[in-house]
């Protein structure tokens, strides 16, 4: 009768008979409080409202034994029922109230526990997000710092290269000034090789021999750029063609648009990288020459 009383109490508290029977079976009929604890913990189970599994039928002997046991239990239950007095309405009300308070307490405890778990999960999520943001920001700062260092290094290398070029040009100018008394900065008109002033030889004048070919120490180079403009400069006859190319690169308005070649139209010739190491005299560019710039 105690089990029936507990089952009835659970049903009176609003639980279905299926849930109440499951709770009592799962807790071994230990009383209302264990059953209530079980119901609170398993109220969200998907099979909470499914009927309990029925024990399969056994042999005829087992059936008979079960029948005998059932009869005995019923007899004992009847005896117990006769001995136990039913609860009064006031007792039922008190018991129900106490059980409802227990249910509310269990629910509050569960909600508080779930709330703490959610707060902890949110803390972990935020902490993880902050760590990722810090790592990302650090990587961006490192990339920006590296890019700035690369730009500073490139600018320094460009500055040093320009200084070397300026120093070389200054040395070349000083060398030309030392050799030719500063005449290298002034345009030099090419001397006529075959023009000889006409003179009337006197009968007593000796016969003049043909002039020997003159060796030139300087040459005047004019370079025509892609836009039709021209650059002119005087170079030593023994300077390499690379000096002319360097002069063009440094004095091209706005800088050269890209790699270029030097050529002559008559005779038609495109100068190679190997020619850049040869002196102007050897390339036939003395005493004057016109070079044309062409894109590679």
UniProtKB/Swiss-Prot annotation:
Pfam families xrefs: UBA_7, UBX
Gene Ontology CC annotations of this record: cytoplasm; nucleus
SMART domains given in the database record: UBA, UBX
Stored CDD domains: UBA_UBXN1, UBX_UBXN1
Bias (Basic and acidic residues) ranges: 86-100, 107-123, 138-178
Keywords: Coiled coil, Cytoplasm
GO biological process, one term: negative regulation of protein K48-linked deubiquitination
Compartment(s): Cytoplasm
Domain of life (superkingdom): Eukaryota
Domain named UBA: residues: 1-42
Coiled-coil residues: 87-177
Biased segments, Low complexity type: 61-75, 191-206
InterPro entries on file: UBA, UBA-like_sf, UBA_UBXN1, Ubiquitin-like_domsf, UBX_dom
A GO term, aspect molecular function: K48-linked polyubiquitin modification-dependent protein binding
PANTHER family: UBX DOMAIN-CONTAINING PROTEIN 1 (PTHR46340:SF1)
Function field: Component of a complex required to couple deglycosylation and proteasome-mediated degradation of misfolded proteins in the endoplasmic reticulum that are retrotranslocated in the cytosol. Involved in ubiquitin-proteasome systems.
Record's protein name: UBX domain-containing protein 1-A
Gene name of the encoded protein: ubxn1-a
């Amino acid at each position: 009768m105690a089990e029936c009383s507990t089952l009835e109490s659970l049903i009176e508290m609003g639980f279905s008979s299926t849930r109440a029977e499951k709770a009592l079976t799962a807790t071994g009929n230990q009383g209302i409080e264990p059953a209530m604890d079980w119901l609170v913990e398993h109220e969200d189970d998907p099979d909470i409202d499914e009927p309990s599994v029925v024990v399969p039928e056994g042999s005829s002997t087992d059936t008979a034994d079960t029948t005998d046991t059932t009869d005995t239990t019923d007899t004992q239950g009847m005896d117990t029922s006769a001995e136990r007095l039913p609860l009064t309405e006031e007792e039922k009300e008190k018991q129900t109230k106490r059980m409802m308070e227990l249910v509310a307490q269990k629910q509050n405890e569960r909600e508080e526990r779930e709330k703490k778990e959610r707060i902890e999960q949110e803390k972990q999520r935020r902490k993880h997000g902050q760590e990722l943001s810090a790592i990302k920001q650090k990587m961006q700062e490192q990339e920006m710092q590296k890019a700035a260092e690369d730009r500073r290094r490139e600018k320094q290398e460009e500055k040093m290269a320009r200084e070397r070029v300026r120093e070389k040009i200054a040395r070349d100018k000083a060398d030309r000034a030392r050799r030719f008394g500063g005449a290298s900065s002034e345009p030099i008109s090419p001397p006529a090789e075959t023009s000889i002033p006409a003179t009337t030889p006197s009968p007593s004048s000796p016969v003049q021999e043909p002039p020997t070919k003159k060796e030139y120490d300087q040459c005047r180079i004019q370079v025509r750029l892609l836009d039709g403009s021209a650059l002119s400069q005087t170079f030593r006859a023994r300077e390499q063609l690379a000096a002319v190319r360097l002069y063009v690169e440094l004095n091209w308005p706005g800088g050269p648009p890209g790699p270029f070649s030097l050529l002559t139209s008559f005779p038609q010739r495109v100068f190679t990288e190997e020619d850049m190491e040869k002196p102007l005299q050897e390339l036939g560019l003395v005493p004057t020459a016109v070079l044309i710039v062409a894109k590679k």
